[in-house]
Amino acid sequence: GPAWLSEKFRGRPQFNELFDSEQVLVRAAEYIRQTVTRYRDDQALESWWVLNEPRRFDPRSPLATARLQEWAAAKYSTVEAVNEAWIEHYTDFSQIVYNPLWERGNYFYWPVPTVDWYQFQRDFLTWNLRWIADNIRRYDTRHIITMNPANVFESAHQYNLPAYREIFDVYGASMHASWQLRLLPRDNYGYAVAGISEILRGAAPEGRFWVSELQGGNNIWSGKTPMCPDSLDLAQWIWTGIGSGARKVVYWSLNYRKQGIEAGEWGVFGFRSEATDRSRVTAEMNRVLARHNDFFSGAKPWQGTVTLLLSPETMRLLLHIDPFECGARRFDRNAHIQSLLSWFMALQKMGCQVDIRYLQDYDWESEQTGRVAILADMIGIPDTIIPRMERFVSAGNKLIGEGLTGFFDEYETNTMQSEFAMERLLGGRMTDLRMRDSLNSIRIDGLKADLQAYMWKPFVEATTGTPAGRHDEGVCALRNHLGKGETLWIPACVSMGSRDIGTRELARLAAAEIEPNLKSQPFRFG
């Protein structure tokens, strides 16, 4: 915004925080009107891009506060219900204001207000994006509207991608190597591009997405993990994005920014537009795409039957737990997405076309059978989703629960101490969980080699299920038949263990469990 409008705009050529007041909304609506009506008939206009990497906002702003109070009233109906859930003493919803403890609580801080706050963050972001898109469409219904989230892996709980189908025509995302791909080791950045692409494709309307920002050149000071992609990097990442279904790849940036942060960094070309190894490989890929346009214009990824489920509920619990800086080093705020990516890489390496879907967005009720759904270290599972999982399995599908899946509900209530809501589904319950300082060897029935699991040694007791795996002290895995389908429950953290030794053992497990699905693919690796 203009510097004269607000103190926060002074000295800032770029500002991508969400709206902070009703007064700003009025001015923003007028800005959108003038901008859209001026450019909507310009032949150079292809799309409207709503904010750059939107996520941040002032939690104490008048607009955020008002929306928070409305959100709490809609969720709890009475202030007494809020007080009971949050351990608070409000007398009116108007007293609810942002509390920093929701994000940086001490060791014993109650989880419910923290989880609710992160849910509100998600919904407030969605509200802002919808407001902007609706105002654009008041004046232009011909051009597509898109957006580009940042840090899709780490911030998937904030981006309600399934809900965005009602807002955007196509999705995008920033995929900068020095920022968004660094959750995986350097030699696995291609898998990171594929993973972000699958998350976008799984949620986007009819799977439409772009790689809307791809790092084009060198970092000096502007990368979390500074690097310079070479021609082979760009070729791998671009073809990976296209192979995952991306309809467009946009560099940040083609040429260099002249002044300020990022000046002299990120460019595909040289400082005076000289050709580089990066620009040459880009030109060659463009020629290939043009030469084979008949194929690429209609090509799309094959729709597989194996799906990894992403749980925003789990990510919110880990955000509540992580600030304590206690416990196992690896089970931090990114533990769930890291475990999911271990499975993703293992499946990709064997040529399995695997989808990634949000837990609540997966089509549990589809009449298609023979599907496989994988829950990786999904520690927070709402009770409301479990009956849908049971019907999914009973209809003739398979569910694999690995790691500490189901250890809590979505509000950090431990599920193992009373009635385990997933017991009918998984065929038993966990009786104990013991920490070990080293990897634990477990043997799954039917596999020739042991699997290595991270730190925790689980002990399980079968009810309707049968033992499917053991360690040196007892049963640690169950297989259960429910209706026409089955479940495999391995509460040992084998995906987390694979981060030390590679994904080969995890791939062997996956191959044994999804063999019929692999055989149905038109192509796979031997």
Question: What is the meaning of each model-derived region?
Answer:
Residues G1, E46-R55, P149-F153, E213-G216, ...:
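Short, solvent-exposed turn/loop segments enriched in Gly/Ser/Thr/Pro and often Arg
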Residues G1, Y159, I220, G260, ...:
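Glycine-rich, charge-decorated loop segments at or immediately adjacent to ligand/cofactor-binding or catalytic sites
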Residues F344-S366:
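A short, well-structured beta->alpha microelement
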Residues S366-I379:
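Short, well-ordered secondary-structure micro-motifs within conserved domains or adaptor modules
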Residues A3-V193, I199:
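Polysaccharide-binding and catalytic clefts of secreted carbohydrate-active enzymes
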Residues T146-P149, E154-S342, D432-K448, A453-M455, ...:
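Hydrophobic targeting/anchoring helices
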